[in-house]
């Protein structure tokens, strides 16, 4: 696949708003990759045209609300995969959370990806001629989150970087196709009630609010009125990871954000997210493929 690189902004181009880091984009006639971080200080809805084709939006952190014609309002909170299928002239509207930056990776595929004969789109995304856009969202698997982090932290330059990112965009599209077709999902998913979902989110809030000294699984389950087995199964259903897996991923994501956005040194960041410096360096390199000192 030939990839044409969009030229970077010129020196005299308008600078992005403080805290907003638009990513580079890679395009061919049927694929585009965009990645970046967006910080919003506005609580207004923002409208933009919907591109024709299939848009795979991986929200790594942060949240937004999305409206598209003919569909109920969607709340998307990272880590999530949101998929929009559109073959008409429509507009979407978004409002972004202001409490934390939105980290995102988007792969836009052409209208050919909407062909139901490909067999990988779920029923709710199948093209209906002349119909409204279709949207669905679900927790993002860890493999997708890892890919997005590799894209965001790519250290290569020039043509090598372009080739690497183009390949990662294809890999992310393939993973999404596998996941949406059901090949990447467990055969049987645990059933949870709305009340249990609320308790699972409460457990998540307790967990991320105590990164330095997180409660044990038994304590956490007791505090939200669930048993450990049900809480673990619910975490996998809602967040795509076990309680421990989610905690580890959240710690490393927060550490990555701190290293990128704050002035703290590596040791300070490690302690703030509940690691010793030695264990932090090992876990960080395993997760992102680079040492934390390479970012700092």
Curated annotation (Swiss-Prot):
Cellular component terms (Gene Ontology): protein-DNA complex
Location of the HTH araC/xylS-type domain: 201-296
Pfam families associated with the record: HTH_18
Keywords: Activator, DNA-binding, Transcription, Transcription regulation
Residue ranges the UniProt entry marks as DNA-binding: 218-239, 266-288
InterPro entries given in the database record: Homeodomain-like_sf, HTH_AraC, HTH_AraC-typ_CS, PchR_regulatory_protein
Keyword ATP-binding among UniProt keywords: no
Induction section of the entry: Expression is iron regulated.
Gene Ontology molecular function terms on file: DNA-binding transcription activator activity; DNA-binding transcription repressor activity; transcription cis-regulatory region binding
PROSITE patterns, sorted: HTH_ARAC_FAMILY_1, HTH_ARAC_FAMILY_2
Function: Positive activator of the genes for pyochelin and ferripyochelin receptors.
Protein name: Regulatory protein PchR
């Amino acid at each position: 696949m030939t990839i044409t690189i969009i030229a970077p902004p010129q020196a005299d181009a308008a600078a992005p708003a403080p805290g907003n880091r638009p990513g580079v984009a890679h395009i061919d006639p049927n694929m585009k990759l965009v990645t970046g971080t967006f910080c919003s200080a506005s609580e207004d809805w923002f409208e933009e045209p919907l591109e024709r084709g299939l848009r795979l939006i991986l929200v790594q952190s942060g949240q937004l609300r999305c409206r598209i014609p003919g569909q109920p309002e969607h709340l998307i909170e990272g880590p999530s995969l949101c998929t929009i299928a559109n073959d008409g002239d429509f507009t979407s509207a978004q409002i972004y959370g202001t409490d934390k930056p939105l980290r995102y990776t988007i792969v836009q595929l052409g209208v050919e990806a909407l062909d139901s004969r490909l067999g990988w789109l779920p029923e709710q995304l199948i093209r209906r001629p002349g119909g409204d856009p279709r949207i669905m969202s679900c927790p993002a698997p860890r493999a997708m989150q890892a890919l997005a982090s590799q894209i965001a932290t790519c250290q290569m330059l020039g043509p090598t970087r372009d080739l690497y990112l183009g390949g990662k965009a294809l890999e992310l599209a393939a993973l999404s196709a596998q996941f949406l077709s059901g090949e990447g999902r467990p055969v049987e998913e645990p059933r949870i009630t709305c009340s249990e979902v609320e308790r699972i989110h409460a457990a998540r809030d307790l967990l991320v609010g105590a990164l330095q000294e997180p409660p044990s699984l038994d304590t956490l389950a007791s505090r939200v009125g669930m048993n450990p087995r049900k809480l673990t199964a619910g975490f996998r259903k809602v967040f795509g990871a076990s309680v421990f897996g989610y905690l580890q991923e959240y710690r490393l994501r927060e550490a990555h954000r701190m290293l990128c956005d704050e002035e703290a040194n590596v040791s300070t960041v490690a302690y703030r997210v509940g690691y010793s410096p030695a264990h932090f360096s090992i876990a960080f390199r395993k997760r992102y493929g680079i040492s934390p000192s390479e970012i700092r």
